[in-house]
């Protein structure tokens, strides 16, 4: 019995170190797998930057201006940038205008909804919609870093109607030159026609005075002196 118990004890003493070594190896493997998983997750997070969803065109909206014009707007995409068309009705008048810009770079980093909401607010706050040639639609999310995202007015039916009327009302400089040059020959002609009449009246007056003061005998001599002394009455 004693020999059997001693053999069992010796076997247990030999097995314990082996079990401890296996347990340490298994613990190391678990720690290594967990660390590698955490490292892969940690490396994967900063590599992916959050980006907004691509814009689905056309984008549409409606608004009412401070001067009670009912308007609607729609955005279409071009090869470079976008075009925003505004159509309004005020009483019996209808007018429209176009804005252009390129917010593509800004929309890749910011939310589309924020940008288009600010564009809609800017349209509603316009004092004279489609009537100011210097009108620019700006947004707080893009205008500092992306100035090309500002939408500028490029065409308007209101501004195009004003120009022809101004050109018709203003006379051209060629018209004024023709009037002045055509009137000058008439003046010279009237001046030239007045000279013979003036000379005939002077001669008649001189002859009358010579006959009254000098008589018929000395009339011709007096007439000669009077023509030298008296000037033309004209």
Curated annotation (Swiss-Prot):
GO molecular function, a single term: growth factor binding
Pfam families: FGF-BP1 (PF06473)
Cellular location(s): Secreted, Extracellular space; Cell membrane
Single Gene Ontology BP annotation: positive regulation of blood vessel endothelial cell proliferation involved in sprouting angiogenesis
Region (Disordered): 25-59, 169-200
Disulfide bond sites: 71-88, 97-130, 106-142, 198-234, 214-222
Domain of life: Eukaryota
GO cellular component, one term: plasma membrane
Sequence ranges of Polar residues compositional bias: 178-192
Sufficient for interaction with FGF2 and FGF2-induced effects, as annotated region: 194-234
Signal peptide: 1-23
InterPro entries, A to Z: FGF1-bd
Bilayer topology: Peripheral membrane protein
Subunit structure and binding partners: Found in a complex with FGFBP1, FGF1 and FGF2. Interacts with FGF1, FGF7, FGF10, FGF22 and HSPG2. Interacts with FGF2.
Similarity remark: Belongs to the fibroblast growth factor-binding protein family.
Name the UniProt record assigns to this protein: Fibroblast growth factor-binding protein 1
Organism taxonomic ancestry: Eukaryota, Metazoa, Chordata, Craniata, Vertebrata
């Amino acid at each position: 019995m004693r020999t059997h118990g001693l053999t069992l004890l010796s076997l247990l003493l030999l097995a314990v170190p082996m079990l401890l070594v296996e347990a340490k190896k298994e613990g190391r493997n678990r720690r290594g797998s967990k660390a590698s998983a955490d490292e892969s997750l940690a490396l994967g997070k900063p590599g992916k930057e959050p980006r907004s969803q691509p814009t689905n065109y056309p984008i549409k909206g409606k608004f009412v201006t401070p001067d009670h014009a009912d308007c609607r707007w729609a955005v279409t995409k071009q090869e470079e940038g976008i075009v925003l068309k505004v159509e309004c009705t005020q009483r019996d008048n209808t007018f429209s205008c176009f804005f252009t810009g390129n917010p593509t770079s800004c929309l890749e980093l910011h939310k589309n909804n924020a940008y288009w909401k600010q564009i809609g607010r800017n349209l509603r706050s316009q004092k004279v919609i489609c009537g100011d040639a210097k009108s620019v639609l700006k947004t707080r999310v893009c205008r500092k870093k992306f100035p090309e995202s500002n939408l500028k007015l490029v065409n308007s039916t209101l501004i195009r109607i004003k120009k022809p009327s101004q050109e018709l009302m203003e006379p051209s400089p060629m018209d004024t030159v023709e009037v002045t040059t055509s009137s000058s020959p008439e003046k010279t002609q009237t001046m030239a026609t007045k000279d013979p009449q003036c000379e005939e009246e002077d001669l008649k007056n001189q002859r009358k005075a010579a006959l009254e003061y000098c008589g018929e005998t000395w009339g011709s001599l007096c007439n000669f002196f009077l023509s030298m002394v008296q000037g033309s009455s004209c």
